[in-house]
C-alpha cells in the first residue's frame, strides 16, 4: 500500500498481516489488518496463542454472570443491564432457537424488509449467539437485538453492556 511504502521510505521496518482475533484469545470473530512499524529493526506480531479447538467461547466469557430479563439491571453491577424489548420483539426472541435468527420466526413475526430479496441477505440479525463458539464482532450497537447476532444464547434478551465489554476483553473492574 502507499502508506506501507511511505513508512519503508522513512526507514521503518514494516509488518502487515490480517489477524483473526480468536487466534489470540479474544472471544469474538473479529478480523483486522494489523500494521506494525519499527525503526529499531525487524518487527512482527507474536505467533497465535490459541488453536481453533482452544478458542475462547461465549460461555467461558459471560456464562457465569447472573441471569437478567430484558430491561433489568443487576443489583450488584450497573453495567450488567439489558435493554428493554417491546412485547413484539420479546415474542420474536422467544421464537428464536439457540443459534438461530429471524429466519426461524413464523411468517407473521418477520419484518417486511426481511421478506424482500435484499433483506434476506442479512440472515444473522435478531440472532442468538452460541455458547460453544466465539461471539460475533462487537459493534457500537451490540446491545441492541436487531443489530446483528447479539441475542443472549439462552435468555430472552440482547446482551448486556457488561457482557459486550467482557467479550471485547475489558476487565470486570
Task: Report the location of each language-model feature.
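Sequence-level motif detector for i,i+2 pairs with an aromatic at +2
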Residues: 14, 30, 53, 133-135, ...
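C-terminal target-recognition/interaction regions appended to catalytic cores
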Residues: 80-173
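Short, solvent-exposed loop/turn segments at secondary-structure junctions
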Residues: 22-24, 40-42, 143-145
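Flexible, glycine-/basic-rich loop-and-beta segments that form/coincide
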Residues: 26-80
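Short, solvent-exposed coil/turn elements at secondary-structure transition points
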Residues: 20-22, 68, 173
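Residues that form generic nucleotide/phosphate-binding pockets
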Residues: 6, 61-68, 96, 141, ...
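Glycine-rich, flexible loop/turn motifs
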Residues: 15, 20-22, 58-61, 146, ...
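Conserved Class I SAM-dependent methyltransferase catalytic core
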Residues: 1-29, 33-37
